[in-house]
Amino acid sequence: MRIRQEREKLAAGDRLEWVSLVFGSAPSPLAEPISRLRRAVEGRTTLLLHPLQRYVTYRTERLTRHPFLHAEMCSPPPEMDLKSRFRWRDFFSNGGTLFLDACPQSHSGNNEDAVADSWKSWGKSIFPDTGWSPLNRGHELSYSFYLLDKRMFLGERGTPVSLLEQDGRVILVHNRSRRWSWDTLKNSTVSVNLNEPLLEIHLRLYINLLMLMLTGDYKSDQLHLPTILLRRR
């Protein structure tokens, strides 16, 4: 009985929640484990992770409860009033990161490009003096986490991902391509090895994002990841 309790305690401590925001009055879907990604991630890192897809209703007063939030850009962004702006700033100053993602095909509507652009402007309005920059081959997120200094091959044009940084830290990620979305990866058949090249790069990029979420200072001092996690906790 005690051994089982210890295992459950360890599993809870290593559980990785990918928290997606739900907008409007619709009830939040139930949380669901992502076993395929768990096996693929564990094959590439020193951690035993238990990825869990979780959904929370959008409330600005609850933002700081989470270190990382994911929002699919299926509708125009919510109003950014003064109170919301300062609550988002509190979220980021507490180490939070927000990922603005392409809308899945099943929920997409008209004017997808215009909606994606409006979210980009919405994100910039939180810190008007900052600007978006593309995720290119020179950025630290393009270096594969588990291969140390090896770059991922992102191609000449990089990815359709833009970053907004504050004080040298990524606080906002904007992806306008459904092909590179979290929904596409989550529903793909991934493995520890032998993935097709594009899917492999897709998976590596998201592992880097997960490590960014967990550590808060991604690869900046080359410490072993468990040490960084203990320090952050």
Which residue stretches match the model-derived regions?
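Short, surface-exposed loop and linker segments with low hydrophobicity and enrichment for Pro/Ser/Thr
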Residues: 9, 87-88, 166
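Aromatic-Pro/Gly-enriched surface loop or interdomain linker
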Residues: 1-68, 75, 188-233
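An acidic, glycine-rich "communication" segment
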Residues: 105-207, 232-233
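Helical hinge/lid and interdomain linker segments adjacent to catalytic or ligand-binding clefts
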Residues: 31-117, 175
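Short, surface-exposed beta-strand/loop "edge" segments at domain boundaries and coil↔beta transitions
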Residues: 27, 78, 180-183
